[in-house]
Amino acid sequence: KEVFFIVYFSNLISANICSCTIESAKTVTLLSGNTLGIEFSYSGLGTLVLEDTASLYQSDDSVVNTGIINLFRKTKPILRYDYTFWSSPVDNQKLIDVSPNTLFDKYLSFDTAGGWKEEPRLNNMLLGKGYAIRGPQEFSITSRAVYEAVFKGIPNNGKVEIELGETDSFGVVGNPYPSAIDAAIFLKKNNLKTKGALYFWMHHTPVTNFEYNSDDYAAYNLVGGVNTEASYSGVNEIIPDGKIASGQSFFVISNAFGTIEFNDSMRILGNNNAFFKPSKAGNFPRSNKIEKHRLWLNFENSKGAYKQILIGYMDEATNAYDLNYDAESLDGNQFVDFYSLIDDKKLVIQGRALPFSESDFVALGYSSTIAGEFSIAIDHADGDLSAQTVYLEDKTENIVHNLLESNYKFTTTAGTFLDRFVIRYNIETLGADQFKNQESLLCVSVKGKNIILNSTKDVMKEVSIFDISGKMLFNTKTINNTEYQIVNFKSSDQILLINVVFDSGKSAAQKIVFH
C-alpha cells in the first residue's frame, strides 16, 4: 500500500509498504530495532526519524528518494580521545554535523597512499567512504560515555562506488545505507577487488588489575569472524557476524586497483545493531545456509593479553591460500599475535577444504613481546567440530594435549615462534606429516611388558609415549644412546604412540600395540 502520514506519529513499528510520503512539518518516528521496508520511494516535506538500530530498507537500485530522514546512531562508550569510524547513510552530510563539539582538527579520512589525514570538518562525507572522528571535547578522558550522532538528509539508495588504491594498500570504506548490509554478499560482489576480509579496529578499556589490553582488529570473511577480547574480561565487544550496521565503516585491503561497489542486493532487514567503536589513531543470493565446521581458539595470559583465531572447514575453501576464506593477521595488538600458517601467510582466519578429515592438521604460530605463562584454549566450536576431540601438539615440549579436557598452559620467552604448535584431530596422525620418511631410523618392539627401542643411524635424545587420547604416559630426556629399554612399562592393553627425538634434531614416531 501507499502510505501518507498527515499527522505526527511517534511509535511506528516494522512494516512493509509500497511507498511513503510524510506531510510538511510532520514527524514520523520509527522505534528502535524496527524496520520500515519501502518498495518504491520515500518522499514528502516531513521527516522520518529512525531511532538507534532502526532501519529503512529498500531493494530496488533504481528508486530515487526525496524525503528527509534523521537517523540516530549510538556508539559504544567512548572517551574524549577515542575515534569512531563513521560512514554516512544520507546525502550531503557534513562531518561537523556528526560530532559538532569535536576539535576542528580531529576529523580524519584515510588516504591510500599516505594514511590518515586531517579532513576539513565542513566537507560533505563522500558516499561509501569511511571517516574517523574523535569524541566530543566535553567528554571525559577517564570515564566513558555513549555518544549519539544524528545523520540528517535524503537517505541513500542504489549503487555506490568508491575507488581503492593500488594492490595491498589499505582503504577505509563504509555502509552507505540506512539499513544493515550483508558482509558476505559485499565480499562476493567485490570478489578479487579486495583480499576478501573486513577489519574493524577495536579499542578496549583494561580491566582492573590487568597489565595489558587487547587493542586489535576484529576480522570477518566468508568463514566467520573473530573477536579481540576474552569473554570474561568485562569488555562487552561484538564478534563480527557478517552484518554491518548503518553508519559503520571498516578497513579493506586492495587486491587490485579499481573500484568497489555497494548496491541494494547487499541490504538486509533488521540486524542494524552491530556497531563497532574503534579508537586512537552480479546479483548474489541472500546468505543461504552453508556447510561450516569451525573452531575458535584463544591465546592469552592472566594479565589481559589476548588474541583469537578461527579455523573453519567449508564449501569452496581449499587448503591453499584463498581470497575471501583466509584473512591475514594485521598484528594490531602491541603485545601478542597468534595465527595459523599457510606457507608464509600468518592468518587470523583460515578456511580449509571439505570434507573434514580427522587426519588433517593445522600449524600455529605466535609472537609475543611478553615472557611468561600463556594458555591456548578452545573458545567455542560449531558443526562437526563441536563434538570433535582437538589436540594441541607442543613440539618444543613434546607434549600432545587434549583441548577438550582443559586449556593448555605453557611458558615462553619474548619473540616469534613459527614451529611450536600444531592442531590435530587424531593422535594417530602425530608425526606422520613431518616424520614419514624417518621411520627407518627407529625400530620399536614389545617383549612381555618391556618396550625396546633401537636407532639405526642416530643417537636417541628423548622418548615420549602417548595413549590415543593424547595423554603423555612416559617421558625421558636422558637417553644419549642408540638403544633404550623401558622395563616393566605400566599400561593396560592399548595402542601407544612412541615419539623419539634424536641428537640431530630429527624425530620419528611409531605406533605399537601394547599387551
Predicted features and spans:
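A short tyrosine-centered beta-strand micro-motif
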Residues: 131, 250, 494-500
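Compositionally biased Ser/Thr/Gly- and acidic/asparagine-rich
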Residues: 125, 137-490, 502-515
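Extracellular beta-sheet-rich ligand-binding/adhesion modules
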Residues: 1-63, 117-121, 128, 135-143, ...
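Acidic, glycine-rich segments characteristic of secretory precursors and extracytoplasmic regions
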Residues: 23-113, 151, 159, 164
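Short acidic/polar capping segments at secondary-structure boundaries
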Residues: 55, 90-92, 136-138, 177-178
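Short acidic-glycine loop/turn motifs at beta-strand connectors
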Residues: 65, 111-113, 135-137, 254-257
